């Protein structure tokens, strides 16, 4: 048998073939609606040497899959057969006998039974789109990134960061990092047992185990893994039985030198309705904040995404997106996807003007125009200084530091240039503004209290 070829067996065959694995993974990753829209009518034709050939029903579907999903599809094929180097997608009429499509059952993670969860098919719960390679690193997330990478690459059973606790707002990259850890381990150390799931699903599985009298099986499954990652731990707040089970699972894994990674929307100390003994343990290892994006980070994320999708977006449109979509990465990428989809559907090139028109409703619903004056008032009030101190030449630390913070927030939350920001602070030179921003960014790397303070001010200003 030629090992470079993918062999499609009859669907009644018990063996699992590569194409069915790939389609199942696409279904798991993207969900039923998107799978049915783009992948369900794609057929496997053949493999020759290092190339797989697929067939799409229309040129439009072929081009759309090529632009958005070709990298993911290739990575999935390579996971099952690393000899594959390229995936080609063609369009042509096919006799029914040559078509290999897959009817997939509608199944959510919550429907998976304990026997399946005990199997080695844990890989399918990791989203191949979320890797370390496509995670854009900047000042707001570099500590979390470095810690997550250290966990994934650790040559020992556990890293020095155990447990690793990632916290921050919605859509800032916590889940991306957790998937990246799992994906990296399964690629580079496939013998290690890794489970990732949300706290909600952890609770669901626990309740199901209680109902079916399978508690011992549940305990064995979760307490025998090498790496356990629980997303959105705040979900178990106020749920006493689930907290009790999580507490004992946590203790068992830590005592046995197994790695834990936890994510949350707030720091351990800010969790309400959760036992103090759990709060304490969540802070045992490294607590890393994934805080709000900077303009530069948003710009980097957009440029990386555009390169992955192989589309042309003019610089002024990219700048517009980075300046206006400030809430989180998820919304930023969603806005970019909307602009690109509109361009593909209408066959119109992307311009600043049509970007503004396409996103008008989104921006209007989110609209909260923040001015430099708003920021100055908020910061002056927070630090109990006069508003006039923002534009004064006084250099006392109690005045200079709040002024630097206000300059930093003005750069993050407004589209103003450094020159324009300087004018609002007593006609200061743009180099003074640059120095202030750099100073605050340096402080944010080591001063957790300041980081939380600035995050809070940003949320208040944005809402």
From Swiss-Prot:
Can you say what this protein is called?
Answer: Chromosomal replication initiator protein DnaA
What job does the chain carry out? Plays an essential role in the initiation and regulation of chromosomal replication. ATP-DnaA binds to the origin of replication (oriC) to initiate formation of the DNA replication initiation complex once per cell cycle. Binds the DnaA box (a 9 base pair repeat at the origin) and separates the double-stranded (ds)DNA. Forms a right-handed helical filament on oriC DNA; dsDNA binds to the exterior of the filament while single-stranded (ss)DNA is stabiized in the filament's interior.
What are the entry keywords?
ATP-binding, Cytoplasm, DNA replication, DNA-binding, Lipid-binding, Nucleotide-binding
Q: Where is this region: Domain IV, binds dsDNA?
A: 344-463
Q: Where is this region: Domain I, interacts with DnaA modulators?
A: 1-84
Note what the entry says on domains.
Domain I is involved in oligomerization and binding regulators, domain II is flexibile and of varying length in different bacteria, domain III forms the AAA+ region, while domain IV binds dsDNA.
Q: List the disulfide bonds.
A: none
Query: Which residues are noted in the entry as ATP-binding?
Result: 171, 173-175
Q: Check the record and name the HAMAP family matching this protein.
A: DnaA_bact (MF_00377)
- Quote the PANTHER family the UniProt record gives: CHROMOSOMAL REPLICATION INITIATOR PROTEIN DNAA (PTHR30050:SF2)
